[in-house]
């Protein structure tokens, strides 16, 4: 019996749901949506445009979007205890691209964890860092502690005086020694960015580290990993200059 295309799509969609209902997936970049979130994602809003910001849309008829987005912004500011939140990104990588666009210019120097040491691919020359045309310098790595070598990284930041200092990884076991490294970055005039995509739920729950209180000027993240929501991303800052 040959299934037509639509039937095959429905079958595979149902099979995917069964897989997650009857197993415990351990993929860090995935999670399970609540029935309430599924209801919102399956609504008519899912297929509508809502370009712009609440109250300043390019399309008419976006009042429902405005209400929902304003609630989301207020909730994000409350959960992460920050002055600014943008929840429009379609992923953590898109949030990183937006942050790099705002905080750097082509040719600027950025420091980050190498992909070999657990850094996210968007932090690499082949990812968002390269798309922005930045000069990448990676941190010396402490293999035993599985974190940036603090003393060597402090020297690297002071010697290179990067425009932007980036922390956060897609593979890591422990909080980043952020406060000390951020202090050194600010001493040389660098902005500090923290990619919290893979640990954002732990940060929100107060059981990891608190990047915005430990020196990060901007924190990005995903809304669908340890923070269990639909596919999307965050831009967060406690800076009074964030808009």
Locate predicted features.
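Conserved PLP-enzyme active-site core in the AAT-like
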Residues: 71-243
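A short N-terminal interaction module
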Residues: 24-28
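Single conserved hydrophobic/aromatic residue that forms the stacking wall/gate
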Residues: 1-5, 9-10
